Amino acid sequence: MGLETEKADVQLFMDDDSYSHHSGLEYADPEKFADSGQDRDPHRLNSHLKLGFEDVIAEPVTTHSFDKVWICSHALFEISKYVMYKFLTVFLAIPLAFIAGILFATLSCLHIWILMPFVKTCLMVLPSVQTIWKSVTDVFIAPLCTSVGRSFSSVSLQLSQD
């Protein structure tokens, strides 16, 4: 959320004589604006959101609309996407950033002061519990399972077809 100082370098050409199959938009070199500010998405978390008009609206070769319709709809798409994003960020960015900050601070506090001490306590007590559990298993459960196994090992079934 910084102050936008550069202007978008997009030009829209609508010649009556040229009927080309491209959109007519010419974009500036990305290297021109690469050093103008900091990278706001250094870990590329939102790289999937970089979509353009051709990613949303596509006309096959056999069904083309008029070039002026295509160019105007492309321009309207880009302008409305730009304006709506700016409008929504003006009203939603600060409150959502505040809410996200509170949420992450709360989760960090719970993780640091409640969850990790509980996990460390469980890991500290676990060897003692493991020793006691092995003793209980060896004294009570193993003989019971052994005797039940021996009892059922002598059972035999015979099926007769009558």
From Swiss-Prot:
Residues 1-86, 108-162 are cytoplasmic. The modification Phosphotyrosine is found at residues 19, 27. It is a peripheral membrane protein. It comes from the Eukaryota. It is found in: Nucleus; Cytoplasm; Golgi apparatus membrane; Cell membrane. It holds the Pfam family Caveolin. Keywords: Cell membrane, Cytoplasm, Golgi apparatus, Membrane, Nucleus, Phosphoprotein. Its main location: nucleus. InterPro entries: Caveolin, Caveolin_CS. One of its GO terms (molecular function) is D1 dopamine receptor binding. The modification Phosphoserine is found at residues 20, 23, 36. One of its GO terms (biological process) is regulation of cytosolic calcium ion concentration. GO terms for cellular component: caveola; cytoplasmic vesicle; focal adhesion; Golgi membrane; nucleus; perinuclear region of cytoplasm; plasma membrane raft; sarcolemma. Residues 87-107 dip into the membrane without crossing it. Phosphorylated on serine and tyrosine residues. CAV1 promotes phosphorylation on Ser-23 which then targets the complex to the plasma membrane, lipid rafts and caveolae. Phosphorylation on Ser-36 appears to modulate mitosis in endothelial cells. Phosphorylation on both Tyr-19 and Tyr-27 is required for insulin-induced 'Ser-727' phosphorylation of STAT3 and its activation. Phosphorylation on Tyr-19 is required for insulin-induced phosphorylation of MAPK1 and DNA binding of STAT3. Tyrosine phosphorylation is induced by both EGF and insulin (By. similarity). Monomer or homodimer. Interacts with CAV1; the interaction forms a stable heterooligomeric complex that is required for targeting to lipid rafts and for caveolae formation. Tyrosine phosphorylated forms do not form heterooligomers with the Tyr-19-phosphorylated form existing as a monomer or dimer, and the Tyr-27-form as a monomer only. Interacts (tyrosine phosphorylated form) with the SH2 domain-containing proteins, RASA1, NCK1 and SRC. Interacts (tyrosine phosphorylated form) with INSR, the interaction (Tyr-27-phosphorylated form) is increased on insulin stimulation. May act as a scaffolding protein within caveolar membranes. Interacts directly with G-protein alpha subunits and can functionally regulate their activity. Acts as an accessory protein in conjunction with CAV1 in targeting to lipid rafts and driving caveolae formation. The Ser-36 phosphorylated form has a role in modulating mitosis in endothelial cells. Positive regulator of cellular mitogenesis of the MAPK signaling pathway. Required for the insulin-stimulated nuclear translocation and activation of MAPK1 and STAT3, and the subsequent regulation of cell cycle progression. Belongs to the caveolin family. This is Caveolin-2. It comes from Chlorocebus aethiops. The lineage of its organism: Eukaryota, Metazoa, Chordata, Craniata, Vertebrata.
